[in-house]
Each structure stands twice: as structure tokens, then as C-alpha cells.
Amino acid sequence: MNNILFEEVLNVTDFTTSRQLTLWKREDLQSPQLDDVAEEVPVALVYNGISHVVMMASPKDLTHFAMGFSLSEGIIDSPREIYGMDVVPSCNGLEVQIDLSSRRFMGLKARRRALAGRTGCGVCGVEQLNDIGKPVQPLPFSQTFNLGNLDRALKHLNDFQPTGKLTGCTHAAAWVMPSGELAGGHEDVGRHVALDKLLGRRATEGEEWRQGAALVSSRASYEMVQKSAMCGVEILFAVSAATTLAVDVAERCNLTLVGFCKPGRATIYTHPQRLIAD
């Protein structure tokens, strides 16, 4: 199976649609005008011909999404267990057709569930409440991060949201190197999908993506903590707050969770020993 770059385009407007809208400003109701609206499409992840999940997502960087989802959901342990991917149009949406190793495919069939997502719902398709949450090996304490370098990352986070700049409708996830520089990032209408894209990209990049932390433009849910931990990410920064379950999961799996990240301040929820404050 050939690994195609279906999602690579030359213009960000390929991921937006012009719609006629009415703009209201105080004491002024303006006539209908054209504005950009972010695209959101159903994306099916199909493993060895069997559809496993349908998620609502932005139609770009989908091979990174498929790789990140496969890793963060425990379908694979290594990118080498995926032999190839094709992104193809399907009825009213897109399919990522994934060639999965036989051993991993047998495991997937054994625990397969009907998971229908709404921009990345972690509970959709889970049959019992006891099934929520996956066992995650406690993370090592091999990383540190100087909080004095976080401001640089925050300043440039929206550089990875070209669609968001046009529409105000996407979340971002980026990889922060210890220097505070951003190695790369992705955007999506779904915050979990944006993170999966980042995790998939990280798994196939070089050594510079091994050190550092993940930064998301949204709140931190338990699933985002769990996905990060499943992929070996030790530090997760979020621009907004964390939920109680996210904090509990982060505490159990030794992940350093930091929320309300703003220039010059942050709220450290768990495992502050990885952080250096100048």
C-alpha cells in the first residue's frame, strides 16, 4: 500500500468553505456577506478492510492522525506495525485505509468496539463505564523543562493554526523543544484529533522530537492526558484548565500536567519535579 500525501495542499482555504452570513455589531446589523467556515468531515479509520472508528475531523494531516490514534489507543506499539496508509474519498467523507500487521489486527478484532466520535469523544462507543480509561504504564522521570522558555512557545502556537486564523474554529497541538521553540504542530476542529495528529507526527520524526513537551490550545481532558501518556509524553501544557479526571489520570501515570498556561504564569497540577523555574 502506498503512503500518499492526500492532505498536502497549497492553500489553507482548501479546508474552509465560504458561507453567506449576517454580521451583528452594536447598533449595526450588516447585510449578508461571505465569510470563511472551517471544514469538518467524517473520517473513517479502516484497518485491513474493517472500519474501526469514524471521527469528525479537519480533512488534512490524516496519515498523522491515523498513526497517532493507533498509538494512543494502544492498537500498535510502534509505527513499524503499520505497513502503509492510503487516504481515499468515501461517501460523504474520507477513509484512511491502514495496512496493519497481522498480530496487531488479531488483537484489534479481539477488543474491537463501535466507536462513533464527535470531534474526539473518549466515551462514545464504550459499552460499560468500567471500560473508560486504559491501563497506562507509569512514565519515567527522564525529562525536565524550564518554565522560562514556555512564553516563546505560547507566542508562536497559533502559527500552526492557519485555518483557525481564518475561521476561529480550530484547536492546535504542538511539540515544544526544551528551548521553547516549536518543532512542529497541527490543527483540527477536534482537540483530541489535533493531539493525535501531533502524536503521530512525533512518532515518525527524529531525535529532536524525543525531548520536550506537548502544548495544546484547549483544556486538558482525561483522554488527552491518557493519549499523551500512552505515547510516552511526560509533560503536557494546556492553555486552558484541566478536569478532575485528567488530574487523577496524570497523577497515576506520572505525567506532569500544567494548565492555564499564559505568558509568565501557569498552574501546575501534577508532578512539578520535572519543571525548572528561573
UniProtKB/Swiss-Prot annotation:
Mo-bis(molybdopterin guanine dinucleotide) binds at residues 260-265. Keywords: Cytoplasm, Molybdenum cofactor biosynthesis. The keyword Transferase does not apply. SUPFAM superfamilies: Cytidine deaminase-like (SSF53927). GO terms for molecular function: sulfur carrier activity; sulfurtransferase activity. The active site is at 121 (cysteine persulfide intermediate). One of its GO terms (cellular component) is cytoplasm. InterPro entries: Cytidine_deaminase-like, FdhD. It is found in: Cytoplasm. Its main location: cytoplasm. GO terms for biological process: Mo-molybdopterin cofactor biosynthetic process. Coiled coil: none annotated. HAMAP family: FdhD. Required for formate dehydrogenase (FDH) activity. Acts as a sulfur carrier protein that transfers sulfur from IscS to the molybdenum cofactor prior to its insertion into FDH. Belongs to the FdhD family. This is Sulfur carrier protein FdhD. It comes from Salmonella paratyphi C (strain RKS4594). The lineage of its organism: Bacteria, Pseudomonadati, Pseudomonadota, Gammaproteobacteria, Enterobacterales.
